[in-house]
């Protein structure tokens, strides 16, 4: 979805509520309960309640309203956002060394997202199903099985797309936020004293009174802003203004009212700490609220799943992950995709997490490290963009960065206390993804360098072939070429073994640009190199999927007629062996071999008919 289409502002804003704010919107299910559950050494005390509420409120204001919605969302690449987009923008006007550091930061941030995405569906759905403990305590043993059943159904429908179901997301989430507001307001009216916590003095008093324990407790407070990255990542779907409008008119007021309503309830009934969210509701509303909470958490999980599909496609297109099958589930919306391998790997990981942790309170200990780590990296990358791309005053940018880090670093440091009790999980998953992405990128570069370091000059070889041509056969041959100035391996091997050349030879290069989309006018560049050789460079954005048939269509419009079923596609298939290296580089090389063996083959990747493909093998030592 984009603001470019002719939908009204209210419709786009409503849609943003349904997709963007699912994660942060379901945080009231567990945040205040975790803050005051007694794990930090204090119970439901007036000063503690006021302190936590004040911290939550001002985090929502500073981190979400000011940092992300006002500052970070200014950094867009043709309207698109996300940590990899920010990485790309930050590295545009910097030195090679600085760019390398920024790329590493961006990849770490993307890896953190993969670590977080395993936890979000599990903690969200489990916290909703745990409402059964209030409705029918004897059913508490069913929480884990029911959570797995709900998530199984969610992952199963991914292959069908979420277009039809997605139309229900917005009204359900709007209802959810309105119910949050009503439940909270009802409780605040009964105990308006809780509104004193709006004063930031209570946050300061909280630190002064509880000292070291208050710092560690920040690890629970951060649960209130999980999902904040989605605001920036989904910017390309809805636009900046609708996302901001949804936050300030619906989401922020509803969250604040509900958190303060829970606080008002706890001041009167401290025993409600076992589940303050559900105990806000009257008895007759518990079952409807349980159903609505389950729907809201499913929607929050769907938003995260869609986010990991989008991030994976972007990483594949930018060359940080191996090619994999990407299925478009909508003819109208390019952003609706399904990646089977990622879907079922994520499902398996989520089920393992649910079975292992058993309760959302246990999972809360694992939550936060990835979120706050990404926040630190976002602060550094976004201020780099402000300085290098927007040319803001360096002292002003430094003040902004210091202000952001004064919040981000304490939050991240407080979450490190969770490392042994569950925080190791997202960090481990993030480390695995970082290793995979850096291995694929670096080893792929090493492979291409080895293949082309002894490559012949393209111009010289074409001149030689035109002067002393081999036997010519009718038809058109397309050779996939990664480098513009080097003869493709497949062409060299075809001449070496078959000693023939087609009447027309097209050297096709598919290139990914540093933009989400490439206009059709710029899609194809054609250059005639000789009477029988042409070079075609097709450019795509990282949100687009290359399609050779579309390239041929554009070539036809520009005078180079190509018919798919009358063309032979020659591709090189590299058989790789790991050469002599230090042991740690040998391990990385073997990981690359494993990734390459399981990567999507080029004919499937570019939608080339299998019966038109000829693969010529070559052995390369890396």
From Swiss-Prot:
It holds the Pfam family K_trans. InterPro entries: K+_transporter, K_trans_C, K_trans_N, Kup. It is a multi-pass membrane protein. One of its GO terms (biological process) is potassium ion transport. It comes from the Bacteria. GO terms for molecular function: potassium ion transmembrane transporter activity; symporter activity. GO terms for cellular component: membrane; plasma membrane. It is found in: Cell inner membrane. Keywords: Cell inner membrane, Cell membrane, Ion transport, Membrane, Potassium, Potassium transport, Symport, Transmembrane, Transmembrane helix, Transport. Disulfide bonds: none annotated. The chain crosses the membrane at residues 9-29, 49-69, 103-123, 137-157, 165-185, 213-233, 247-267, 276-296, 337-357, 363-383, 396-416, 419-439. It catalyses: K(+)(in) + H(+)(in) = K(+)(out) + H(+)(out). The keyword Methyltransferase does not apply. Responsible for the low-affinity transport of potassium into the cell. Likely operates as a K(+):H(+) symporter. Belongs to the HAK/KUP transporter (TC 2.A.72) family. This is Low affinity potassium transport system protein Kup. The gene is kup.
